[in-house]
Amino acid sequence: MITIWVPKRLVEIDLYNVAARSPQALAQLSENSYARRVQYAAQKVRGSGAKIVMLTGPSASGKTTSAHCLAKALVQQGTPAQVVSLYTFCKGAAYSPKMPDGTLDYENLETLDLPLIKQCLRQLSETGKTELPIYDFATEQRSAAVEPIDLQGGVCIVEGIHALNPELTGLVPDDQIYRIYAGLREEYCIDGRRVINTQDIRLCRRTLRDA
């Protein structure tokens, strides 16, 4: 399945003027544009017949938000949908790679329980049902409990930084997977010169989110 991809565009001074006159108007304009893209993605997913959507993007790109918005759009269009975070499959601090400072490296693929992901994805693609692990970030350990999931004939949206890694997308038949890359597409310029790029924006978003 093809990945949904939107080319970047440079935002010129006209949009700055909108922001200066009414920040609320700019926010609404941005929300409307985003909503149209989400609705478009939902239509493409429904048309693909895939049971599993693999959604990824860089840090602070809006992966989790987009996954839940996509699920809502799918439900509105008549397709049941549920969201699964790849963080659910973390093995735990005792079994995962560490950063140089000793903290858990959540962005390392080896942090995830790949055999269990394979099992769950295959069960979802074949039966629409599986049992998901529950990860406790406070204790950095996997809970003994599990979470049953039933797609009810719908779609599972798997979101995470490794969602498009071939190690994961190759676990189930290609016709059962739809791939989506979520990322910021607007960069801001003055006189054709880029002054705020998507990396700057993501850094600001992550700072606001995690500070």
Residue ranges and their predicted role:
Residues 1-40:
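Charged, amphipathic alpha-helical linker segments immediately N-terminal to NTP-binding catalytic cores
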Residues 53-55:
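Hydrophobic anchor at the beta1->P-loop junction of P-loop NTPases
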Residues 60:
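Walker A (P-loop) phosphate-binding loop of P-loop NTPases
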Residues 63:
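Conserved lysine of the Walker
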Residues 72-82:
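Post-Walker A helix-loop "phosphate-sensing" segment adjacent to the P-loop in P-loop NTPases
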Residues 82-84, 91-140, 155:
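Conserved nucleotide-sensing/catalytic segment adjacent to the nucleotide-binding pocket
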Residues 158-207:
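ATP-dependent NMP and nucleoside kinases share a basic, alpha-helical "lid"
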